[in-house]
Amino acid sequence: MRRKTAALAAALLLALFPCTALAAPSTSAQAYAVVDGETGRVLFSKNAEEKLPMASTTKVMTCLVALERCSLDEIVTVDPAAAGLEGTSMYLSAGETLTVSDLLYGLMMSSGNDAAAALAYHIAGGIEQFAALMNQKAQEIGAESTHFVNPHGLPAEGHYTTASDLAKIAAYALKNQAFARIVSTKSMDLPADDDSPARYL
């Protein structure tokens, strides 16, 4: 499972930047797609259409959907179902209020599963409803071999993508200036307020 996830993560990273290499990469990855970040042209691939679990690379689509449906200064109240979610976290508390911007930085910089769920409940009222929005966006992008079940990437039946689709999603997301800014941020301090502690991401 870890090797499959790493392969898809590699595909995402390779999609983020223009690639001028002339030799196929030397890797043990089960699947990959090396694309030119400017043109979208596939340079090299291996098992690029194989459906695999996508783990935290799920959050690329979560971030994209949130950016297209919310303003960054919109206030989110953390749903109890999002607080304390297993796995990587930005340590949200039920009832805490943060901006969409804060949650997106926690989502992408801390890989916060709780941030993903908090955004899902805020935007769509639930995990299943938000996953439907993610699947709708995937179809719009042309990622036809991708299916989302949740916004965070925790293991779930029917939650999968391909290296090829992941590259398409990443390339599309990077056209969004806010997304590009978030994923290029190295560190961030979120100051404390009345009901939220200070956080360092």
Model feature map: region roles:
Residues 39-40, 53-77, 166:
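Active-site SXXK
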Residues 80-94, 134-147:
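Active-site helix/loop module of the DD-peptidase/beta-lactamase fold
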Residues 23-45:
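A short, well-structured edge-of-sheet supersecondary motif
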Residues 51-57, 94-101, 109-113, 124-132, ...:
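Soluble non-cytosolic domains of exported or imported proteins
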Residues 86-117, 198-201:
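Conserved catalytic neighborhood of penicillin-recognizing serine enzymes
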Residues 26-29, 126-201:
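Penicillin-recognizing serine hydrolase domain
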Residues 2-23:
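Sec-dependent N-terminal signal peptides of Gram-positive bacterial secreted proteins and lipoproteins
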Residues 68-81, 177-185:
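Short, well-structured active-site flanking segments
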